[in-house]
Amino acid sequence: MITLKVNDIEVTVPRGSTILQAAEKAGVFVPTLCHDKRITPYGACRLCVVEDRKKPGNLIPSCFTPARDRMEILTETPAVLDAVRTQLQLILVNHPLDCPVCDKAGECTLQDLVIRYDIAEAPFGTERFARYVDRRSPLIERDMTRCVLCGRCVRICGELQGRDELEFLHRGYKTVVGTDGGRALDCDFCGLCVSTCPVGALNDKLFKDRTRVWKIRKEASVCNHCGLACRADFHLEEGRLRRVTPAAPAAGEKGLLCARGQFGWRAFESPSRLGTPQVRRDGALREAGWDEAVNHAAKALDAVRRSHGAESIALLTADHLTTEEAAAWAAFRRDTLGGGPIGSIQAGGYRRILEILAGARGARVAGGTPRDLDEAEALVVLGGGAAELHPVLKPLVNGWMRKGDKDLAVVSSWPDTLTRRATLPLTVAPGLVEEFCAELLEALGPERTKPPAELARFGIDSCALARLSGREGTTLACRYSDGPRLYLFMPFLLDEAAGRVAVQVAVTEGSYFDTTAKTTLGWVVAAPEEPAAPRRDRPQQTGGPPQKRPPGGAHRHIGLDHRASL
């Protein structure tokens, strides 16, 4: 750790932090246009300059300059303010003053900086270079007349999404951002470039010209297109959804959404969706109120239960139940109906995995977070199509692998996006991925083997993995026999069987539903624990299935987020 002063405010930051990060921790504003916490510093805009009191007159770009111990940084000296104003005036030379018709007005970083630094006129006049507006994409409009060449869209596409769809074209005064050959966008349409653009150069076509940002209010929520539960901001105008944007990244997060999350919101307002309950009368479905529909269903179920018993009523769950819905469904089955079988459309090969989890003795299976992936040395993806089912996983893995010597293993029956990047692609026969995963979980179980002390903290027993009946687990065990910090990701449980597993665990085991957990990305499998005193920081359970302490000591904690993701 190092200690320095920013505008006479003392702040301590980890060694290797930049001056800009130190200023942010001290609560001191430093202007930027090209900086985005999700990507590497670039230093293109030169607005973030600061001055070192010990070296007066020497302006330092704070976004990529490492902070040093006992520095004394000043951000509002006359030299700094003059440099910032001059740079803003130079940027405005080729930026049109069309704020009244620009969709970015009201949330434009350049507009905010011009007002903050009182830029009343642009003294540097020159003939504007005629750029272009590309409207060929169905979702993203690129208006290069407003581009300030900060490079954020170019870098975020390459560093996180791994597509390098955008690049700098030409040189000098004629430099523009575009695609190779000037073609239309042909990418994943993740919307990262739109979310990072500080001006109105990249626009969401579903939102453009439909309203103004000061007329909408933001509601923090999560995307519900898959089980990753990415945090998102829903922009509403008079109760109508206008757009969805990634939420500001918190610690350990990247602030990501995929194409479905950012541009698929119109599905929520489809006229084909049911808006009110319907009750069948005289052979036809007719709209009804909620009270009438609930009473109608209750009478029908009660009549069947009285005539044929509770076991005659089978419950079939949906695959995208939230944790709260799963808990309510389980309570309804247990307390109201008094029993009855429960199942899901996607039972498949997941039953054995559920049985292994339900039969664990003292094992702790906890939900992971992006922070866990950042700290991992190795990532094992169990099941194919992870990036296709959950597109946000792709930029997460790309960003993780750029941080150094990382090991990616993918167990799949077919090549997919992550398989092409894997350092250890493992192929199993179609239909046997679930069987392989079950064998892996069984090998990790405390009843089967006891992990060596040096590997216990990783929850991995490589010796047990090597005994997986000649399956690819042997290769996996040899690969990680030195005990790297391993992170497991099981995409199939996040989607098809998540609801069923959640309900089954709730019904058969009464396990704790951790609805306060952060976003769950996968499973971090830990070693058995010794019995411990109850945690004082855990909130008291107010509803849902009762908690049980399984045999063998430690409480089995199955971490679920509110998208029912294990």
Q: Where are the predicted features?
A:
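Eukaryote-biased recognition of intrinsically disordered, low-complexity regulatory segments
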Residues: 1-7
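Conserved short loop/turn motifs at secondary-structure junctions
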Residues: 10, 33-38, 143-146, 176-185, ...
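Catalytic alpha/large subunits of respiratory electron-transfer oxidoreductases
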Residues: 96, 210-545, 563-566
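A basic, amphipathic helix-loop patch mediating RNA/tRNA/ribosome contacts
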Residues: 19-53
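Short, structural beta-strand-to-alpha-helix junction motif
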Residues: 3, 17-21, 66, 322, ...
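Fe-S ferredoxin-like electron-transfer domains
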Residues: 46-189, 194-222, 228-230, 237-240
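Short strand-coil-strand connectors
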Residues: 7, 53-55, 499
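Short, contiguous acidic and Ser/Thr-rich linear segments
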Residues: 10-17
